[in-house]
């Protein structure tokens, strides 16, 4: 997400997979920290493999448009299969059982990222 934010902030095209929209489940720093502690507590031998992800499904186009709006910008999407991937929406059932749920709403996480990385561009 940070790479796309940097492109937005500098008015550069964002490479996107041509199978649009591209959905994923972003996870943000507070959830990574909290779920990281839960992962350490769940550790065992042999290792337990748990994928981490956010709980909300959102398109890259939607969250980029939202972050661009926060900065008073328009996103520029460049659809290409080179260096991009299609939607990735993993099942969170096992993560919920072992680690718990992600709690940060994607809009709140995006806003926090803009505030942290580009506070001078944030429209108040």
Tell me what each language-model feature is:
Residues 9-12, 96-104:
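Short, flexible active-site recognition loops that position polar ligands and cofactors
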Residues 4, 95-96:
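Structural element of the ATP-grasp superfamily
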Residues 2, 30, 34, 108-111:
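Short, contiguous clusters of charged residues that form electrostatic/catalytic patches at enzyme active sites
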Residues 33-86, 92:
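Mid/C-terminal beta-alpha module of Rossmann-like enzyme folds, strongest
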Residues 24-30, 55-58, 87-90, 101-104:
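Residue-level signal for the nucleotide or nucleotide-sugar donor/cofactor binding architecture
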Residues 1-24, 29:
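NAD(P)-dependent short-chain dehydrogenase/reductase
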Residues 106-124:
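Amphipathic terminal alpha-helices
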Residues 7-11, 39-43, 116, 120:
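Generic structural signal for alpha-helix termini and adjacent loop/cap motifs
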């Amino acid at each position: 997400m940070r790479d796309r934010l940097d492109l937005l902030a500098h008015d550069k095209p964002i490479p996107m997979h041509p199978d649009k929209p591209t959905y994923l489940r972003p996870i943000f720093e507070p959830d990574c920290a909290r779920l990281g502690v839960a992962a350490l507590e769940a550790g065992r031998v042999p290792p337990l493999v748990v994928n981490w992800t956010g709980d909300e499904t959102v398109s890259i186009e939607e969250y980029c448009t939202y972050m661009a709006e926060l900065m008073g910008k328009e996103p520029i999407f460049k659809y290409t299969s080179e260096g991009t991937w299609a939607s990735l929406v993993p099942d969170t059932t096992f993560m919920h059982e072992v680690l718990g749920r992600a709690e940060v709403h994607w809009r709140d996480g995006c806003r926090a990222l803009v505030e942290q990385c580009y506070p001078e561009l944030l429209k108040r």
